[in-house]
Design a protein with these regions (language model features):
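N-terminal carbohydrate-binding accessory modules
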Residues: 2-10, 16-76, 87, 102-106, ...
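A short alpha-helix capping/helix-coil boundary motif
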Residues: 41-45, 77-81, 147, 248-252
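Short, contiguous strand/loop micro-motifs
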Residues: 50-51, 86-88, 151, 257-258
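Short, solvent-exposed turn/loop segments enriched in Gly/Ser/Thr/Pro and often Arg
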Residues: 51-53, 78-81, 114-123, 178-187, ...
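Aromatic-lined substrate-binding rim segments of carbohydrate-active enzymes
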Residues: 61-68, 73-141, 164-168, 270-277
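Polysaccharide-binding and catalytic clefts of secreted carbohydrate-active enzymes
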Residues: 138-291
Length: 291
């Protein structure tokens, strides 16, 4: 599992060693990286993702024994566990997570605890189908896979940040939890979202970037095929226009940049929600090479 610390400062002029990271976030604390990740604060964090909730609890002891035998000292837990932590909207179940964190910690294996937002429970999709992203044809992406949610959905963000705060309140001071794992494999299934939420957010993003519609028209070359716009309210996202049509390359490039920014903003929102409660532990995440 490869991790990184966000917002590290390349030209840090302080006397701190190079692996010490600072952040502009007032709720963050400086920390040494990656020493704090391990249980004893020494050595290299060695391990991977661990999904104990996908197995019968009676095999956990054997899991831990084999981890120790392999030299594992850190595992990421609960990446896909939102439905186990919050099986219903008004019901929370931390019992199983308490037990596995305690079992790992007592064995000297540190926990990089996930925000568990990589995939949402089905009850959330059933109640709020509008949180699903849409493909370029206007079809909602079906629930049941990773990242089946729109990063621009205010409804989804509200539920996700509530989960983050609940986890931080319960485990922020737990000595066995040495880091936070935000999201998972960003951009895997929702980097390109063509929903109305995304459209509205893209218009605001374009206005912030270009300032005037004249600047945007010039950058996108919108005189071609009569695409000139009179205001940012006319900006479109590159939805499907027909098999023989081509998307404006400037529009497409900015939509790619916009998608990246929306995922980064979502990461920061989760991070900050936890940092308000637990400011003294590092934050990590991971990526798929293809995204």
């Amino acid at each position: 599992m490869r991790t990184f610390n966000d917002e590290s400062k390349e030209n840090n002029k302080s006397k701190e060693p190079s692996h010490t990271s600072n952040s502009d976030n007032p709720n963050r604390q400086p920390f040494k990286w990656p020493e704090l990740l391990t249980d004893n604060g020494k050595g290299i964090a060695y391990g991977g993702d661990y999904n104990p909730d996908q197995w019968s609890e009676d095999v956990w002891d054997e899991d831990v024994r084999l981890m120790k035998q392999a030299g594992v000292n850190t595992v990421a837990v609960a990446i896909f566990s939102w439905d186990r932590i919050q099986p219903e909207e008004n019901r929370w179940d931390f019992g199983w997570l308490d037990r596995i964190i305690d079992k790992l910690g007592k064995a000297g294996i540190a926990v990089d605890l996930a925000s568990a937002t990589a995939t949402a429970p089905l009850w959330l999709y059933e109640k709020h189908p509008e949180v699903l992203p849409q493909d370029k044809f206007g079809h909602p992406v079906n629930a049941g896979s990773r990242q089946s949610w729109s990063p621009t959905s205010p409804v989804f963000k509200e539920y996700a940040l509530t989960l983050c705060r609940k986890l931080a309140e319960r485990y922020g001071t737990n000595p066995y939890v040495t880091a936070w794992h935000m999201g998972n494999e960003y951009g895997w299934n929702n980097r390109y979202d063509y929903s109305d939420n995304a459209l509205n957010a893209f218009r605001l993003w374009c206005e912030r970037k270009y300032g005037t519609i004249e600047n945007l028209n010039k950058a996108w070359g919108t005189t071609f095929w009569g695409q000139e716009m009179n205001g940012f309210h006319e900006v479109l996202i590159p939805r499907f226009m027909g098999a023989d049509s081509m998307v404006n390359p400037g529009q497409k490039l900015d939509f790619e940049r916009f998608g990246n920014d929306m995922l980064l903003d979502f990461y920061k929102a989760e991070r900050d929600a936890i940092a308000e409660i637990c400011p003294d532990k590092p934050f990590t995440t991971n990526f798929m090479v293809s995204t």
